[in-house]
Amino acid sequence: MIRIGVIGQSGEIPIEIQQLAQEVGREIALRGAVLLSGGTNGVMEYASRGAKEANGLVVGILPGDTMDRANDYIDIPITTGLSFDYRSLILVHSSDALIMVGGGNGTLGELSAAYLNLKPVVILEPSGGWAKKVRTIAYEEAYLDERKSIKLDYAQTVKEALDIALSRIELNKR
């Protein structure tokens, strides 16, 4: 079972980002992978919706002890009893690879956690937010520091993002 995490901003998001997130979720499901996310709103909700529309399985790694914040498209809600930042660590550790759609401060934390834990991240650059800016601040455009622990990947389309994520997962199995 392949598990792909989707990270991106919560709250209200522009319609273009809604559509991209939904397309990411749909493509994850069509490729036979399980979608993992923080399970609440924003990018997480639209990605979950896209996966459900394609009959995919959606897991929400939720903050707190209740399912009150879970979006309507979550099949398996997992309450962590943790704050948003700590539940993100569980999301990162539970994912085989992650796709970054847009993003704010919390998404940067998830990106950093993924890098520290050697998890492949594909950054969907046209989605705006930090996804559009990471390359400009990354070390040699591809790393979060000079140790070059794991290369960040960039994609211009959703299909390209999934192709890269799945190939990185396959390489990590070897």
What do the predicted segments below correspond to?
Residues 2, 8-12, 81-159:
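C-terminal binding/interaction regions
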Residues 36-38, 60-61, 154:
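General beta-strand structural signal in soluble alpha/beta enzymes
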Residues 19, 26, 30, 41-111, ...:
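Acidic/glycine-enriched connector segments
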Residues 25, 158-163:
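Short, amphipathic alpha-helical "lid/cap" segments that border enzyme active or binding sites
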Residues 1-17, 26, 30-31:
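Generic N-terminal amphipathic, Lys/Arg-enriched alpha-helix
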